[in-house]
């Protein structure tokens, strides 16, 4: 009887093992093919109406839909996780306190001063040229530099060509820029550019700029049309000069340790959705710019379009500075963005 009972026990165990091998469930109870259940955090510097936050929201919606709700992304605009401090926000994505982020290259300069090479003045003619260069050799440069800081590059989208607004007077010549107190990101490119024009550039957190202009601490700011609109600069600035002096990308990034801890299937999903969100962001920003400029006019801003001769005068005024930037970033970095240094 004992021998017969032992045989029955072995048979039952074998049957359990056979059935478990044929089950559609994985070890953690998920059905085969389901995504892991995880919530990720994503930080952006802009307000919820700015392009970086909109791209992040678009990305989060794609991820949740395609994962069946298993993978979710909580988006935090205004660098809420870092109390509005962009530099601290970047430290958090680098350390893994935040999982995902999107920051402009000039903002990322706090951890790698060689990242914003593509912001050197007047190196791209238009958005199409910028995309062609970045999506060929530029992205490899970004990926390599970010990897050294513990971050994984997932894509880029337009922050926009930077324009100039101020509350003092119309700007048509280099002399018009002299002595203007202009807010710039803390980047060697922007600080140096406005110094070369004789302005008084000041680095300041973006969240403080509107009030500083309102109070007269600043005369103006330089940024893309989209950010200028979403921040309602038309309420405190009377003049806009369209000069496309610098192209800026936002880089979509993940903390590398967090990224490598994810299942391959989840990585594939996030990479796919990030790529689509970046494409959407590029298209959206370009499509909205013309209407936004018309809105500025309706709000009472004087919008100035520079002639070719006026543009040439600005380029001549900063020619020596541009060469300094070519030398600063180096031949390899410049070559990655099609710059003949």
Positions of predicted regions on the chain:
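A gly/proline- and charged-residue-enriched helix-loop-helix capping module
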Residues: 125-145
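Bacterial N-terminal signal peptides that target proteins for export
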Residues: 1-9
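N-terminal secretory/targeting leader peptides
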Residues: 23-127, 147-148, 152-341
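C-terminal motif of bacterial Sec signal peptides marking the signal peptidase cleavage site
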Residues: 17-21
